[in-house]
Amino acid sequence: CTLALHGEDALDNLPTDQRLARYAQGNADNGLEELYFAFGRYLLAGCSRPGTLPANLQGIWNDDFHPAWDGKYTININTEMNYWPAEVTNLPEMHQPLFQMVKELSESAQGTARTLYDCRGWTVHHNTDLWRMAGPVDGASYVWPLGGAWLSQHLWQHYLYTGDQAFLQTAYPALKGAADFFLDFLVEHPKYGWMVCAPSMSPEQGPPGTGTMLTAGCTMDTQIVLDALTSVPVSYTHLRAHETSQDL
């Protein structure tokens, strides 16, 4: 998979740092954009091979006893972002380590959903690790139980790109479990009457002047819930499962 934007041949002879400096000043460089496209694919191919661990913020090499971000997976956007190129740039094989992690979390994190929220399904918060930790960590504002649902949408995206029915059959329990959690977790907004997540937050952001990141039914959470609750019935239809849509 390559990106052809037809840049100027003369710029290809410039060192990359000079091209970056030119680009930062507003000069067009289609060839540099092609190079960055290839660089993104290279990074994913270099740190997420089938049979290995998923890509994280730290990278695959570490010389510290206490690595950056503890070497964990930050799943309130960073892990997902690492894999945004996987399907669209034709690297589906590099998605496999993430799929394995999601499958394992969908099993281990059922206890988290049940114990912390008395909900069905499974849920993960903003961090996980080698041992598939699923509970909230760090400050109170990170009680954000939508990490699993967001991760699960990578399974659905892979199916949309590939049409692989066998894959969808194996992915369906994780997709359904992520959606089941919201059937029990959502509550009615006291002012508007909508069914929303509460507590809810857009990770690492908050309304100015409030002193908190917590709210009820923030836009990001609502979109994740919508994706989870709509992908499952469509999956069911595609698989011709032996369930009724009400059971989903």
Residue ranges: model-predicted function:
Residues 177, 181-235:
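Acidic/histidine-rich catalytic neighborhood
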